[in-house]
């Protein structure tokens, strides 16, 4: 039946928005389903054009059954388009959300480390494999746009810093939960973050590592 594939696409996208998990893995881009919907839409367009051409203008104004048939096909094609746009808009929102959750760290976001806690039964092991080539281009462009925007006042404000829990102190005690290796802090100090170690450092120096899951506050 017309529209069944589009409804399946929207339902699969809607289910991901119902979860309360903040780091819900983005489902893999549904390319086969998208192509099937596009094919159905093109077939509807071809059918509408063929019927309209074969019956002529006079029949289109007098034959109510014919008008009803064309209207149903036209509405089905428009519905397919709306469903695909809703699906893509949901994914774009999810991509942006994950960029902010990662503190603007694009390399980390696209690495397997960012999906270390993802359900092994997920259809995509990491974000990179879940995105289409066009979505990857969008993510890189979005990243470049935000980096360019915030570069003018980076010494005053970091837009990617979390604001849900404002820091209460300048210094913070952290424990390394995942090896990060040697990191040069803004102060020039070199710190070797190994799992299990504890440090007391300025929050601003390690905020990004906390967001990315290498460190946790203690």
Swiss-Prot record:
Q: What are the record's GO terms for cellular component?
A: CMG complex; GINS complex; nuclear replication fork
For biological process, the GO terms are: DNA strand elongation involved in mitotic DNA replication; double-strand break repair via break-induced replication
Query: Which compartments does it reside in?
Result: Nucleus
Q: What broad class describes the main subcellular location of this protein?
A: nucleus
Stored SUPFAM superfamilies:
GINS helical bundle-like (SSF158573)
Q: Which CDD domains match?
A: GINS_A_psf1, GINS_B_Psf1
Assembly and interaction partners: Component of the GINS complex which is a heterotetramer of SLD5, PSF1, PSF2 and PSF3.
* PANTHER family per record: DNA REPLICATION COMPLEX GINS PROTEIN PSF1, PARTNER OF SLD5
Q: What is this protein called?
A: DNA replication complex GINS protein PSF1
The primary gene name is PSF1
């Amino acid at each position: 039946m017309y529209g069944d594939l589009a409804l399946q696409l929207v339902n699969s996208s809607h289910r991901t928005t119902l979860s309360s998990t903040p780091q819900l893995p983005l489902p893999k881009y549904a390319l086969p389903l998208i192509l099937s919907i596009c094919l159905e839409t093109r077939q509807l367009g071809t059918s509408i054009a063929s019927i309209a051409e074969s019956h002529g203008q006079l029949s289109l104004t007098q034959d109510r059954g014919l008008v009803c048939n064309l209207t149903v096909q036209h509405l089905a094609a428009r519905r397919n388009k709306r469903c695909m746009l809703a699906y893509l808009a949901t994914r774009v929102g999810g991509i942006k959300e994950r960029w902010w959750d990662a503190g603007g760290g694009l390399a980390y976001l696209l690495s397997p480390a960012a999906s270390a806690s993802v359900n092994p039964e997920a259809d995509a092991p990491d974000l990179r494999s879940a995105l289409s080539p066009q979505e990857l281009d969008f993510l890189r462009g979005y990243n470049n746009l935000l980096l360019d925007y915030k570069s003018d006042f980076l010494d005053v404000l970091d837009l990617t810093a979390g604001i849900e829990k404002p820091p209460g102190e300048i210094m913070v005690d952290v424990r390394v939960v995942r090896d990060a290796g040697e990191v040069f802090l803004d102060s020039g100090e070199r710190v070797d973050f190994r799992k299990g170690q504890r440090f007391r450092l300025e929050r601003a120096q390690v905020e990004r590592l906390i967001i990315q899951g290498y460190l946790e506050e203690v």
